[in-house]
């Protein structure tokens, strides 16, 4: 049985004062991260296709970040909500593994939607919040090993995440030193995206067999969110700004965000 993992809550908060904007906030890691941030007393602006449930210190915005019109709407709403207030952080957590299958079989519209959601939207959201970020503001892009490799049948996802890696590097070049930008790989997490990877016919998507067999190793979204929260709020400015992605399976970091006596016993695939 996997042990419950909770981060140290007594570590010094390194995040500047201000709002935190989270995309992909209605499900998976994004939703859990919103809960953690709110519990820490941080005001959150949550962006998602389906608006999050109302909560104290939460502003929920509904927009489709996978097309140009929806993205423009999201940016306009975001600027209105910010209303000149400081933004301490932006977490780009929105993503989708679909469409699945060979890249050459995907439609132009599906490919453009994937790129817009996972590469263009992070750029436009960063551009929207950067003018309101104080020195020390942070942008955290949720990435994947698919940003560094190619997996059969995941061509559109890999393409988009490779683009997100380039976005991270470009934003770092454009915004440093005032605003720091980091990339985080949360591992194999038990979210709806995993269900999307298990459900297809293995004859059409061979990796479905792997994902069906890997369910026991999936990390609960709440634990992945705790790791994201630690990186965003409790690492030092120098640490956060490191060039390599943060990786949840990195044992060197685990003692810093796991409670004493807890174990991270999820096997890296």
What is the meaning of each model-derived region?
Residues 72, 86-89, 95-112, 153-156:
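Conserved mid-core segment of classical short-chain dehydrogenase/reductases
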Residues 79-84, 117-137, 173:
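Amphipathic alpha-helical dimer-interface segment in Rossmann-like NAD(P)H-dependent oxidoreductases
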Residues 138-163, 168-176, 185-189, 195:
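Catalytic loop of short-chain dehydrogenase/reductase
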Residues 183-184, 202-261:
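C-terminal helical subdomain
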Residues 23, 86-95, 118, 141:
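Rossmann-fold scaffold of SDR-type NAD(P)-dependent oxidoreductases
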Residues 26, 31-34:
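N-terminal Rossmann NAD(P)H-binding glycine-rich loop of SDR-like oxidoreductase domains
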Residues 56-69:
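Rossmann-fold cofactor-recognition segment
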Residues 104-123, 136, 164:
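Catalytic Tyr-X3-Lys loop
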């Amino acid at each position: 049985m996997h042990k419950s993992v909770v981060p140290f809550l007594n570590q010094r908060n390194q995040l500047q004062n201000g709002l935190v904007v989270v995309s992909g906030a209605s499900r998976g890691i994004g939703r859990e991260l919103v809960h953690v941030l709110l519990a820490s007393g941080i005001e959150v602006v949550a962006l998602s296709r389906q608006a999050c449930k109302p909560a104290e210190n939460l502003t929920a915005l509904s927009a489709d970040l996978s097309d140009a019109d929806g993205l423009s709407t999201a940016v306009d709403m975001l600027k209105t909500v910010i209303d000149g207030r400081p933004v301490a952080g932006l977490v780009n957590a929105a993503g989708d593994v679909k469409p699945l299958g060979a890249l050459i079989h995907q439609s132009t519209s599906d490919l453009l939607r994937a790129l817009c959601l996972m590469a263009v939207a992070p750029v436009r959201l960063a551009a929207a919040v950067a003018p309101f970020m104080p020195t020390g503001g942070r942008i955290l892009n949720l990435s994947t090993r698919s940003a560094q490799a190619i997996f059969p049948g995941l061509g559109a996802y890999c393409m988009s995440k490779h683009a997100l890696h380039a976005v991270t590097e470009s934003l770092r070049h454009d915004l440093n030193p005032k605003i720091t930008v980091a990339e985080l790989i949360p591992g194999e997490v038990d979210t709806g995206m995993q269900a999307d990877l298990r459900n297809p016919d293995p004859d059409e998507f061979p990796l479905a067999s792997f994902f069906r067999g890997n369910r026991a190793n999936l990390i609960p979204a709440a634990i992945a969110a705790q790791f994201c929260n630690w990186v965003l709020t409790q690492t030092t400015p120098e640490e956060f700004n490191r060039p390599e992605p943060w990786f949840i399976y990195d044992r060197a970091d685990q003692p810093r965000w796991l409670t004493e006596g807890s174990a991270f016993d999820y096997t890296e695939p």
